[in-house]
Amino acid sequence: MDYTIETLARGTKVCINSTHRFGTDAFLLSDFCGLKYAQTALDIGSGCGIIPLRWKDRGHKGMAVALEIDADGTALTNESIKLNGFDNMLAVNHDIRSWETDMQFDVITCNPPYFTAGKPKDDEKKASFRHQLTLTDNDVAAAAYRLLKDNGKLCICQRPSQLAAVIYAMKSNRIEPKVIRFVRQRKDSPHPWLVLVDGRKNGGVSLTVMPDLIMENDQGGFSDEVLKIYN
């Protein structure tokens, strides 16, 4: 299997190829979920395993599962696990809708491809291996409800245009949206390009909208908050 290696801030190696790579949104989501040191975590549609690998890079010691429907993505994740010598991370090649496990998780994340309808472009066809077009927001929320501990957390990043669908899917599956944060490229950008949503299984009804996360400073470099997230 051909791949190249990216190295994260604290030395964790991530195997990637032309289909299974990672971008800024994976870093933002991995940070936003606030995973604690010993919690159990699942990443749905994990691709090359970047989100669980990032958790490990930041010192996470609990069990982390990278679930991916495409066997090539799972193979890349397994290579990364071997290279880094992680014994508390598991790569699973399966469809989340039919995956059965005795594990219950404190935190579940999902970073879906950002298209939902119409004819996908060639690159989008490659990306759809991960879990969409066929996996819906409702599928993710239903699986999360089944696999989360009580009051466990489901964190999703999506395009802002899909926010209503994410909230509806969560509430339909007894996951209460608790925190929303929009991401803007610059503080004067007219519209956000991403939204991060945190929902709790069987949570109470209350919602916090955090201040927008701004990607760039006035000089065009990364903002202080983004630099902290990357490092």
Model-inferred region functions:
Residues 9, 36, 59-61, 86, ...:
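Short, well-ordered coil/turn elements that cap or connect secondary structure elements
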Residues 19-22, 136-185, 190-192:
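Conserved Class I SAM-dependent methyltransferase catalytic core
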Residues 29, 111, 140, 199:
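Residue-level signal for inorganic ion chemistry
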Residues 112-139:
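Mobile active-site "lid"/loop adjacent to the S-adenosyl-L-methionine
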Residues 188-231:
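SAM/dcSAM-binding transferase cores
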